[in-house]
Amino acid sequence: MMYKVRNMRETEVVISDKTANPAPLGLLGFGITTILLNLHNAGLFPINSMILAMGFAYGGIAQILASVMEYRKGNTFGTVAFGSYGLFWWSLVLLLVIPNLKFLETSGTAAASADPVAMASYLFMWGLFTLLMFIATLKLKRGIQVIFISLAVLFFLLTAGEITGSALITAVAGYEGIFTGAAAMYVGLAEVINETHGRDILPT
């Protein structure tokens, strides 16, 4: 059976994306938590539950949520970046918590704390990943480029601090990390302010 359709009209359907921009959530989750951790690295206070809680919640969950939202928008870079660094924070919290779990000690399956070589390897791989991600940022705004190159430097400084055992290098890394976190906070808040006002008030 054959049907003939005549005078068919073509209509253009425009679908508008009304979902929010997830990048500020991810950038602020990363930035604030990074500043707090690196205040510790700079020697201002010892590692404590505040850093672990922030690493799990705002550093981890917020960035993973941002990653899922970026996925729904079809943004591969945002998906990989926020997802990876969100899971980085979770892995760092686990590295600090697992050796101190009492029930593992009583069951005879306690894991030893990561030694300096293991931690240096861990930090170096994250530095390498960040450096390669920086290449992708060369097509993005300058603020994102600053965040990624400074984060790569931070990871490599922390790697050097672990290998050498130098408190000075770790302290320098801490101050550099504070700058990295502040850069992420600035870009995140700038995007919120610019979008709210409907024009570019703060450059990114």
From Swiss-Prot:
The keyword Membrane applies. One of its GO terms (cellular component) is plasma membrane. InterPro entries: Gpr1/Fun34/SatP-like (IPR000791), GPR1_FUN34_YAAH (IPR047622), SatP (IPR047623). It comes from the Archaea. Pfam families: Gpr1_Fun34_YaaH. GO terms for molecular function: acetate:proton symporter activity. It is found in: Cell membrane. Signal peptide: none annotated. The chain crosses the membrane at residues 19-39, 42-62, 78-98, 116-136, 143-163, 167-187. It is a multi-pass membrane protein. Keywords: Cell membrane, Membrane, Transmembrane, Transmembrane helix. GO terms for biological process: succinate transmembrane transport. Its main location: membrane. Belongs to the acetate uptake transporter (AceTr) (TC 2.A.96) family. This is Uncharacterized protein MTH_215.
